[in-house]
Amino acid sequence: MNVPKARLLKVAELSAKIFDQNFNPSGIRTGSKILNERLKGPSVASYYGNPDILKFRHLKTLYPDIEFVDLEEQYRLSMVEAKKRRGKGAPKKMKKDAAATAKGKGKKKK
């Protein structure tokens, strides 16, 4: 029971119309897969939060005469201090002369 290729293509085309799919018999890259996906714009925009909400640093710039207390910043600084006391803090920066000799750019030996 051989069915002509033209009839199979017609059936595939009708099936694509019924199920709202793209009919691409030649297999050309059309980008329809990407165009049919949901748009990512709203989810990306909502990831960064509402830009209209005032943040703490904005309050400090709007009202410089009022001394606000940033609890999150105080907590961060206390944790940094605790790490330093335990020897887990950031290393001290090298001085300019020490950095030059460490890289071999100091005085040259004859």
Swiss-Prot record:
Where can this protein be found?
Mitochondrion
GO MF terms held by the record: structural constituent of ribosome
Using the chain's own numbering, where are the disulfide bonds? none
GO cellular component: a single term: mitochondrial inner membrane
Stretches of Basic residues bias are at 84-95
Pfam families, per database record = MRP-S33
Q: How does it assemble?
A: Component of the mitochondrial small ribosomal subunit (mt-SSU). Mature yeast 74S mitochondrial ribosomes consist of a small (37S) and a large (54S) subunit. The 37S small subunit contains a 15S ribosomal RNA (15S mt-rRNA) and 34 different proteins. The 54S large subunit contains a 21S rRNA (21S mt-rRNA) and 46 different proteins.
Describe the function of this protein: Component of the mitochondrial ribosome (mitoribosome), a dedicated translation machinery responsible for the synthesis of mitochondrial genome-encoded proteins, including at least some of the essential transmembrane subunits of the mitochondrial respiratory chain. The mitoribosomes are attached to the mitochondrial inner membrane and translation products are cotranslationally integrated into the membrane.
Query: In its UniProt entry, what is this protein called?
Result: Small ribosomal subunit protein mS33
Instruction: State the superkingdom.
Output: Eukaryota
Disordered as annotated region, ranges = 84-110
Query: Where does this chain mainly localize?
Result: mitochondrion
* Keywords attached to this entry: Mitochondrion, Ribonucleoprotein, Ribosomal protein
- Family per UniProt? Belongs to the mitochondrion-specific ribosomal protein mS33 family.
Q: Name one GO biological process term.
A: mitochondrial translation
Q: Which InterPro entries match?
A: Ribosomal_mS33
